[in-house]
From Swiss-Prot:
Biased segments, Pro residues type: 247-256
Protein name in UniProt: Forkhead box protein D4
Lineage of source species: Eukaryota, Metazoa, Chordata, Craniata, Vertebrata
Region entry Disordered, spans: 1-70, 234-256
Keywords: DNA-binding, Nucleus, Transcription, Transcription regulation
Provenance organism: Mus musculus
Tissue expression: Not detected in any adult tissues tested.
Amino acid sequence: MNSARAGHLRSTPPPSPLSSDQDEVEIDVLAEEEDGDQTEEEDDEEESHKCLERSLQRPGARTLAGRSAGDCGDLSNSSGFLRKFRAPRTPATTTADGPQPAKPPYSYIALITMAILQSPHKRLTLSGICAFISGRFPYYRRKFPAWQNSIRHNLSLNDCFVKIPREPGHPGKGNYWSLDPASQDMFDNGSFLRRRKRFKRHHPPSGGHPHCPFPPPAVPATLHVSQPSLLLRYSAPPQPNLAAHPAAPPRSHPCAPLHPHPMRYLLLAAPAYGDNPRKAEGADPATPLAIPALQPVLGSQPWERDQSSGTRSGRGCASFTIESIMQGVTGGGTGSAQSPSFAPWSYCHLLQHPPCLLHPQAASPLFHMSAGSRTILPQQPQPPLPLQQEQHHCAISCAPGKGVRLGQHLSAVAALLRQQPAADDGRLTTLAALSGREGTLPEF
């Protein structure tokens, strides 16, 4: 064995220095490693080929492989498409996020006025006004539904806008709106930026009657009796001499008649107060205690004598007293020729029913007098002829069928009047005082 080793050493080349020996050894090692790597790669290729053969042997493997390859291509293509799509989209977003249009400095009233004035007929509907505002101002175009109710409220709540109904021949929806002619100067110098003041339409007062420049006709006051239905209406006949009589003040008011065709009655306008002016002033016809009544005009002396006292009372209306009747009877003989002719008088208006329903039982209490007044009244000559004619006319006009009985009652009253002496002033004063304290007639 030693000899074999020695022969092998002799056949090998001589040894080189240490450095050279180490390099050769390293070179040999690297060569061996490369050979191992190549063998490993070859083995991997063989295994991959075997796997491919196995996959091809399975059904549908080709479609899957095609899909996977197509998916990879689609992803590459989609990424490119997205890049192309995003590029033009960036300027659109910048424009949307840019500055919005500012709100116009006009009020809703100014905007509505602009829309109405630019229309050819100077009137527009609500939809036409909104269309003008949204077309003129971009700010309101972007926020259209929000401000339409504000336009509607301003149209209905401001007096400067007038609603005009739609004509029957013009189909459509909604009324027209126009400007009030009195609101033309609502803005300063035609500038819609500033309004002078709030316009208000002047409405006429509801239920107001035009003022009458003339005073109401002179009519005496109504009678104040126990029953409110017993009212009078004065109807004065034409008087020949109006300057001799004082006019009634305009404060008196007329009253309604009892029936549609009342008779014409005469009221003595100037009461006879006699020698008691204080009682005359207290007996105002407007008070419930005073009872104006009818009196036959037999002479002008009581009228002329009591003219000053009638003007002092402030009313100038008739007041019933026994004294005035007595003075009219006593002065009737001398003053009948001087007094103007008046229409006959009657008491039918004091009844609640028409004159045709008059009964003597209803008329008798009107002429009934108390026993105390009968004892005071003595005998006196007969009354003049005009009084009898007036009594007869009243009896015929009031109750045609009962004229006889009514004439008897009137004659009884005339007999009572005849018993008053002409010169007995003390008894007249006493009787006037009694009638003034009672305030009403005994039978009323």
